[in-house]
Amino acid sequence: MDEFDRDLDNELEFSHKSTKGVKVHRTFESMRLKPELLKGIYAYGFEAPSAIQSRAIMQIISGRDTIAQAQSGTGKTATFSIGMLEVLDSKSKECQALVLSPTRELATQIQNVIKHLGDYMNIQTYACIGGKNVGTDIKRLQQGQQIVSGTPGRVLDVIKRRNLSTRHIKMLILDEADELFTKGFKEQIYEIYKHLPPGVQVVVVSATLTHEVLEMTGKFTTDPVKILVKREEVSLSGIKQYYIQCEKEDWKFDTLCDLYDNLTITQAVIFCNTKIKVNWLTDQMRKQNFTVVAMHGDMKQEERDAIMNDFRSGNSRVLISTDVWARGIDVQQISLVINYDLPLDKENYIHRIGRSGRFGRKGTAINLLTKSDTIELKALEKYYSTKIKEMPSNVNDVM
């Protein structure tokens, strides 16, 4: 694992709105964590806490409700995972912590991070997600899982079936909270929360936190410590952003083909707004003998898992996807993101291009525009207080 870009990481501005004097822990040793957890942290590849980790981990361990926002790729998942692992009772086989995520892939990735960090702790964790046989979930839950990472629909299902006991849950984590609180997830989360014991600790984590999300989390948090980054400073530092004017929609494909040789230098993700567009673009690229893989929400879970594993391992170099892939999926080698379509939701821009600069590395984002996209590009620049430049004629100058 690459080290954090310490200069970039230290630029993040934190505003502790509900409390003053949040202590900053510059080393993991200063947190006085369990020796076996500390061993897992170092084995995973961390050397020193990132800005969010140095502030939020101890707040979580202390039992405070915590709202944490930080740049994509600064170790938010490890932040709540370390806090959670420190306070769990490894001798009890009851479920003690519940993590909710907006996508199956993210829930599975969180499970893997927890497994690695808790490698020396004898902690059982399980990804409870849709797309899998519920019978398998029931069997695994009956074996005893101290941490469950899942999607709201499936988690609520196993709670209602009484296959997941909530009596001993002391921590609820909402990851990528802004997406979780969109229509469809909000009601399920409230329903899950009603089944949890009174006084359960709530940890809210996201790269972006809207005013609406902060309002909603206020309904089930008590005097939370807020560790926030100003919106315009989130996730864009260290990522070079460009646009290519294509005039017509039809010209985008030719432009993408011209860029293909540069896509495979490391790994690249191409985002489209619809599943139909993903399938169409994948077919067109393959007809031109370009090697690409595709992923969207209509695929079976086994197929999505296989594609993710291939992409993680580097066997496939170019992935075409909808926004199902944009949030929190951690593949270290990605250095280029192409927005074939500008995102429909401004908040998703940050999640998409944040993939290209994981853990403080430098990345490049290229936006393919038609004339009608120009207004939306200007709106993105204003929203994030950033400047998106026109792509130089020599692509090698920016890659």
Curated annotation (Swiss-Prot):
Its EC number is 3.6.4.13. One of its GO terms (molecular function) is ATP binding. Residues 57-227 form the Helicase ATP-binding domain. ATP binds at A70, Q71, S72, G73, T74, G75, K76, T77. It catalyses: ATP + H2O = ADP + phosphate + H(+). Belongs to the DEAD box helicase family. DDX48/FAL1 subfamily. A motif (DEAD box) lies at residues 175-178. ATP-dependent RNA helicase involved in 40S ribosomal subunit biogenesis. Required for the processing and cleavage of 35S pre-rRNA at sites A0, A1, and A2, leading to mature 18S rRNA. This is ATP-dependent RNA helicase FAL1. Transmembrane segments: none annotated. The gene is FAL1. The lineage of its organism: Eukaryota, Fungi, Dikarya, Ascomycota, Saccharomycotina. A motif (Q motif) lies at residues 26-54. GO terms for biological process: maturation of SSU-rRNA from tricistronic rRNA transcript (SSU-rRNA, 5.8S rRNA, LSU-rRNA). It is found in: Nucleus, Nucleolus. It comes from Lodderomyces elongisporus (strain ATCC 11503 / CBS 2605 / JCM 1781 / NBRC 1676 / NRRL YB-4239) (Yeast). The Q motif is unique to and characteristic of the DEAD box family of RNA helicases and controls ATP binding and hydrolysis.
